[in-house]
Amino acid sequence: MTVLSVSYSLAHVSRRTAGGAEQVLATLDEALVRAGHRSLVLAPAGSRCEGLLIPAQVPTGILDDEAKCEARRAFKKLLDRALNDYTVDIVHMHGLDFIHYMPQCDLPIVVSLHLPLSWYDLEALRRVQSNETLVCVSDAQAQTAPRDLRVDAVITNGVDLSRFHPRQNKSNYVLAISRICAEKGVHLAIDAAERAGVELIIAGSVFGYSEHLDYFESMIRPRLNEHIHFVGLVGGGHKANLMSGARCLLAPCLAPETSSLVAMEALASGTPVIAFPNGALSEIVIPGQTGFLVNRSEEMADAIREVDSLSPTACRHEAEARFSSERMFGEYMDLYRSLLASQNVALLAAA
């Protein structure tokens, strides 16, 4: 089987990136190659994948409307060329802006909706063709779909459990890992840590959108000190060590989370999650067992004081039961095979 995966037009794909959609794409790409399939990945130049990268030259720096349009044009041109140059069985779209470069073809097209449905062009989603399959990444996300929007499947994201290892003896810091932007509520994590009197390590990327840059400069940088640290993007062993050593992960997200890979990674590391109950976070965290769900930074501070009562082993067991990348890959493979079988039946009927 040959799968052509298409990223968001302005986000690099790798296992180290801050974006959940890009991490999922990278995980599926690696699993496809490991299973003996052919994986093609259309993504911005500089992305890292196990399959064949089809690199798009897209703008860097300030990501304004002009940059978005330029990136989409580049993706559209490369995607059309790739479908002409390669024999592809499945096209899998991952980007928020996929509608701007959706290929006009008869191949099965899977669209994973990684972000809140309200962020997409809903009218365009309502006009999906019969060969296009819309996938939500959590039940919480699917439940937000308007009645007239067809959601074809729900496949919960997963993480590579082998990269994370629990520690029974935790260090004395709490952790926040996310994109550094207002909807992730990083400033509220700082509020909670200061109120609880604990050290906070903040990790993640500040993307080149003006509102993200302004948020970091006005709301985060002025509050950094010997107790509040910003370490930037982390990955690999550094990320795994930070995760396993933390007393807990703070996730005060203000937007409805469609998924949360970082919360799944924390549980895989034996680290409880204290989160606002927005979207899928309320599905991931089991209050009193693998973390706490709170509504304000003051409650988050109180929960930090109680988090040492939770079992790292229970957190790990929950990750193993529900959030493995193997389970996610298996469900996508089942979907791919089902779509190809349906296509073959339709071709035979038309013959």
Description of each model-found segment:
Residues 1-351:
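Catalytic cores of nucleotide-sugar-dependent glycosyltransferases that transfer UDP/GDP/TDP-activated
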